[in-house]
């Protein structure tokens, strides 16, 4: 059984009510529940964490190096465009990760079109709303099952 870690960045706790025309009506609790069911059905465990604080996410990524985490799914949200610290933590722990976005950042404002994570990620899933998480989990489960 592999352990997967799902990290949600700032403002994702507001999913379902924040700009639903951009991010949809699905809540973060709904997403986490669906991911837990998906991982469990494949015989794996998942832990989810949302934080609006960069240092909390950095601390959790650093802990992943020693706690048996096999794969990370991360939606850095606004930190996508600003967080060298989170990028450096992911690079330092060397746990493979997939970058996730509900919307497609490439179709949004210019400042949202640069990611500090994409070049380090195994892959990027974006633009499919809450399904972006499901597709990323599918890919992660295939990878951990192959090892």
Curated annotation (Swiss-Prot):
One Pfam family hit: DHquinase_II
Enzyme Commission numbers on file: 4.2.1.10
Binding site for substrate: 75, 81, 88, 102-103, 112
InterPro entries found in the cross-reference section: DHquinase_II, DHquinase_II_CS, DHquinase_II_sf
Pathway field: Metabolic intermediate biosynthesis; chorismate biosynthesis; chorismate from D-erythrose 4-phosphate and phosphoenolpyruvate: step 3/7
UniProt keyword annotations, A-Z: Amino-acid biosynthesis, Aromatic amino acid biosynthesis, Lyase
GO molecular function terms noted in the UniProt entry: 3-dehydroquinate dehydratase activity
Substrates-to-products reaction catalysed: 3-dehydroquinate = 3-dehydroshikimate + H2O
Active site feature: 23 (proton acceptor), 101 (proton donor)
Marked site: Transition state stabilizer: 18
Taxonomic superkingdom: Bacteria
GO biological process terms on file: amino acid biosynthetic process; aromatic amino acid family biosynthetic process; chorismate biosynthetic process; quinate catabolic process
Matching PROSITE patterns: DEHYDROQUINASE_II
NCBIfam families, per the entry: aroQ, PRK05395.1-1, PRK05395.1-2, PRK05395.1-3, PRK05395.1-4
PANTHER family: CATABOLIC 3-DEHYDROQUINASE
Family indicated by similarity: Belongs to the type-II 3-dehydroquinase family.
Assembly and binders: Homododecamer.
HAMAP family (UniProt xref): AroQ (MF_00169)
Physiological role: Catalyzes a trans-dehydration via an enolate intermediate.
Protein name per its UniProtKB record: 3-dehydroquinate dehydratase
Organism, as annotated: Stenotrophomonas maltophilia (strain K279a)
